Amino acid sequence: DKTDPYGTSTEMPPATASVITANASFEWQDGEWMNARKKFKARKEPVSIYETSLRDWENPTQLVNYVKKLNYTHVELHPVMEYLNEEDGEFGTFAYYAPTRRFGTAEDLKTLINELHKIGTGVFLDWTPAHFPRHEEGLENFDGTPLYENPDPSMAIHPMWGTYLYNYESPMVKDFLLA
């Protein structure tokens, strides 16, 4: 009853099963932006980041127009990955490679990013690599052992949030977070 840690789609929460979907081909049209980003000098050029929740925009076109009008260089989007419930909020991620279905499909997210890139705007996807929520369907004791969390119980739980702390000493955890 665990969600596939590398799954790219899930049922609509609160259900948590991974869903196998056809990997539709997406035709990116952001080549100009991708080339420009190679020349970007982060320490020498001004950056202006608009942080926003996907839930704040009913229509992604409104977000693109707003960002363009105010000349933001980048947008930081959250929540992006699938999370279990509204009580945990967007930081209760249980499917790190699956875009949340609450705001559309994976194709919708790609389209939004593509449109932002086409107006010259970079995109940051906000996520939490520091800790993960405590729930049976997720990474917690994934194979019956502390596979992702710190095996030392005194170092496994974040004292303020009550979430599991990743075991950064594990090569598997590093690979998972960097994949």
PLM region spans:
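Substrate-binding/active-site clefts of carbohydrate-active enzymes
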Residues: 31, 38-44, 53-58, 62-179
